[in-house]
Amino acid sequence: MKNKKIIYFLCTGNSCRSQMAEGWAKKYLGDDWEVYSAGIEAHGLNPNAVKVMKEVGIDISNQTSDVIDPEILNKADLVVTLCGHAADHCPVTPPNVKRVHWGFDDPAKAEGTEEEKLAVFRRVRDEIGARIKKFAETGE
């Protein structure tokens, strides 16, 4: 079995964006990468994130909301921050760990009816999915 590279998705609360990213990455990168996600804090898995990912056939309901694990952070090959807060507050990583920032809106901040909120979750879900698919195809 070949050694997989480690990708670590970070956002503020590990409830929406990084959870969706973990789900997409397991689909697109699972053969070559070990996929993890975490937050500066752990806010619990957002039920709307679970719902909209299920719509595209990806079950994230068993993923857990975790705070950043220094051990994973320090041995990751790639750390991806998904919000400005995580980019600003992410612990220092060793020089061998590549860090990139892919910014996405926070769907948990969406206002309006339940349907309007879900529309924002779907948009962010699709944006994250497209970004990870591009990374899977191009390596960047």
Curated annotation (Swiss-Prot):
Its EC number is 1.20.4.4. Keywords: Arsenical resistance, Cytoplasm, Disulfide bond, Oxidoreductase, Redox-active center. InterPro entries: Arsenate_reductase_ArsC, Ptyr_pPase, Ptyr_pPase_sf. It catalyses: arsenate + [thioredoxin]-dithiol + H(+) = arsenite + [thioredoxin]-disulfide + H2O. GO terms for biological process: response to arsenic-containing substance. It is an enzyme of class 1 (oxidoreductase). HAMAP family: Arsenate_reduct (MF_01624). Catalyzes the reduction of arsenate [As(V)] to arsenite [As(III)]. Belongs to the low molecular weight phosphotyrosine protein phosphatase family. Thioredoxin-coupled ArsC subfamily. PANTHER family: ARSENATE REDUCTASE. This is Arsenate reductase. It comes from Geobacillus thermodenitrificans (strain NG80-2). The lineage of its organism: Bacteria, Bacillati, Bacillota, Bacilli, Bacillales.
